[in-house]
Amino acid sequence: MAAYNAPVSNCQFRLTHILPIPQRHGAPTDPFQMNAIRQQSDSAEPLRHDIRLLGRCLGEVIQACEGKRVYDTIETLRRTAVRFRRAGDPADDKLLQARVKQLRGNDPNSVARAFSYFLHLSNIAEDRDQNRRQRERALAGAGPERGSLRQAIESLKAQGVNNARIRRLLSEACVMPVLTAHPTEVQRKSTLDVHREISSLLVQRERELTADELSELDLALIGQVATLWQTRMLRYTRLTVADEIENALSYYRSTFLNVIPRVYGDLARLLNREPVKPFTPPPPPLEPFLRMGSWIGGDRDGNPNVDAATLERALLRQATVLFEHYLQEVHALGAELSASTLLIEADPALLALADAGGDDSPHRRDEPYRRALIGIYARLAATARHLTGQKLARRATVPAAPYDTPDALAADLAVIAASLSARHGAPIARLRLSGLQQAVTVFGFHLATVDLRQSSDVHERVLAELFARAGDGIDGQAVDYLALDEAARVAGRELAHARPLASPWIAYSEETASELAVLRAAAAGRARYGRQAVLQSIVSHTETLSDLLEVLVLQKEAGLIAPPGETIAPGDGLMVVPLFETIPDLQRGPEIMAAWLDLPEVRQRVRLAQGDTQEVMLGYSDSNKDGGFLTSNWSLYQAERALVDVFSARSVRLRMFHGRGDSVGRGGGSSYDAILAQPPGTVAGQLRLTEQGEVIQSKYKDAEVGRWHLELLVAATLESSLAPQAAATSAEDAHMQQHAPAMSFMSELAQRTYRGLVYDTPGFADYFFAATPISEIAGLNIGSRPASRKKGQHIEDLRAIPWGFSWAQCRLMLTGWYGMGSAIEAYLETGAQGAPRSRRARLAQLREMASDWPAFRTLLSNMEMVLAKSDLAIAAGYAQLVPRRGLRERVFGAITAEHGRTLAMLRLLTRRDLLADNPGLMASLRERFAYIDPLNYLQIELIKRHRAAQRRAGDDADIRVPRAIHLTINGIAAGLRNSG
């Protein structure tokens, strides 16, 4: 343990080489690119320093905890990997693989942990560097950063958009990140907590420090890294839904509860015509347009572990965490607002609130704000006990009745704010009160809106059972609902019947009973915590109009919607949201929505209950798995344009819900650029998008990073919604008229190429399950939902998320590029109908699309990032895991050829090397490859051992082997910074 007290520089685990480490496919030769790398190297000195510091800390910890032999083994592997990445000598690559194969006993686990933790530490340093650069830019007086709220507001004002228009949009807007518990989050909460502490210590080291203070911080850093090393990286039991709920709530405590009110405050200041003066009253809270959503506890699609109890738990735990925050803030306000009426007057309304608070202490007789806050605290505490039953850490000192609604709490806080502002207390109100006021308008008593989601075939079976058990069927006719065609189902007018289908005296199947219980729990949750607690019912695999109508009938059974004949009130029921996922569903989506909105009973509900707003969700994951990268993106784009036309013709506001993941194959990439690249009219102030897996922790584990990502979402929504639409629409129409035939041609060819490999190649499923760690991922305990919908090795049954995760692990990233090369090449060679006649002219057209059309430019940019992370030499090692040589050569040969073709076509269109225009990302990747490579080689070797042991004994006799595999999965995901 003496090493912990030694200077940080004593022992060096030198995972610290930053720039430049060439990629396998060659170092950059473009002089402009080399100059960019040199500039990046100069500006990366603070980042380099932090990574060296953390690397030295890790080295000390490893040597102290594991001994010099293990440390030397790790360092030898590191040096070999770095040497190969620098010089590209194949002998070093072979030596690295040979040394990995020699690892025995516990050494594979130690090596996997060492490289994984260094990549985690690098991520912490990079996130900190992003914050540092933004601050340095502001201190230097540079213009507002692209994607910032300031840049968005200034840009809009320069285009003639005034504050009134911005405020009008915000009053009706909806920007909602939705946290989901999809199984790509491979980090434990325990390690994330340590990450936050390390990040905080790095921030503290940037201050001007004495030698003693610096030494103390360095000791604290080593202590945190030692904690990380001695904390189990893996979960040995599968996550439960309750675990996932708690994991998500940790981000509210660390980020959302404090940061979201700050984003509102920043925006309010930017919209203020005059510079903020200290004693000018702060503006009232903005209308709540930025809110949080969640699928955790309500997403039943394919997860048998989600039911009414998990929904109730999610709502309860959310409210509990929220009231803890409110009570803490009100208590802190009581300490801050010490103004005395002996020194300054207070408003009569404030005095009345103080008198009603019940505090009769003579020590506070002249302190009306404190007396009022004691009463508010007591009412909040009573509300918390009433709604959640929680035991409070700090009891109220006076008895009080609970608040009925968040508006009542907001009204009391407004009384305090008004009195302060009228009595020269505006600067005091800004300290804490304004943020709490905004928080109450945003979070209410519910914290986040929990969506319900279920597959359409489940709804269909439930309704069929209800009809069968009711006896009189549809319109009084006994029928087999499942046997009806679509026309007969739509013709059923069950919504108009007042009588219930379900009976409390009938024992229904487990599935039907569970679905009805979930809907009843949603109704109870809305009554308890407010309607915002549950707002949407998402229908996965929406293929027909009846898929949506069935959910309305089930809501009627659960008492969620007004009975027939009663007035439909605003907010009545849950909005039925179709989820279009596959390529055929995306193509049918606009037609289904037109029919939906044309139904009189639906149109009335949309108008009265939903404020003329209808949400549509688009699935990026399944459409990609179904049709490949290009076809998925093009189908999504066409569907959005068609939906805009459908909704515009019916004067209904369209809200798009984007089911994006963190990998490009699942719609990942820059959220800001993706929003700006949406077709004109698709945003219009309405945006929901999923935040999944590694994205949640990378974006929101740190308050400042989280604030920036929320700012990006709001800024992009404002710019996309309010920038003059006429020119944008005209330009988009011109692009579509000129380039849609080319896109459709390439999309069809890309889909044919992709499906030819994935679905039409005999034995492809066997190849995939052998050449990727998909089987090992299934045992990683990283989510409550199974990796496959059914047992067996069929690509069709595999969920899209582990599908993408597996391709990322073996460094192929196939979901983010496959088929593009063939599509572009075919268009250049043959062209589509109406295309330019010569190859040169077609190439000029594609280059114009790449430079001028945001949709195509963003597509290529995302693909470029994926290709930069791919590595065929590593992937070839995974291919060797396939026992059948013919299958291995056939499939990997096709992948290799398409990879080379896609790289060549991308270079042809962009006329530059990969990521030449993004030296920062390129530098980060070049640094990481030398530390990801050993993990990949180790994973391959361990999978061989694990599968061989399973064949011999039916199980692995040495539990260390599968655990080491899981450690490599964790590290590779951290190194690539996206996974599934």
UniProtKB/Swiss-Prot annotation:
The active site is at 182, 625. It is an enzyme of class 4 (lyase). Coiled coil: none annotated. Its cofactor is Mg(2+). It catalyses: oxaloacetate + phosphate = phosphoenolpyruvate + hydrogencarbonate. GO terms for cellular component: cytosol. One of its GO terms (molecular function) is magnesium ion binding. Signal peptide: none annotated. Forms oxaloacetate, a four-carbon dicarboxylic acid source for the tricarboxylic acid cycle. This is Phosphoenolpyruvate carboxylase. It comes from Bordetella pertussis (strain Tohama I / ATCC BAA-589 / NCTC 13251). The gene is ppc.
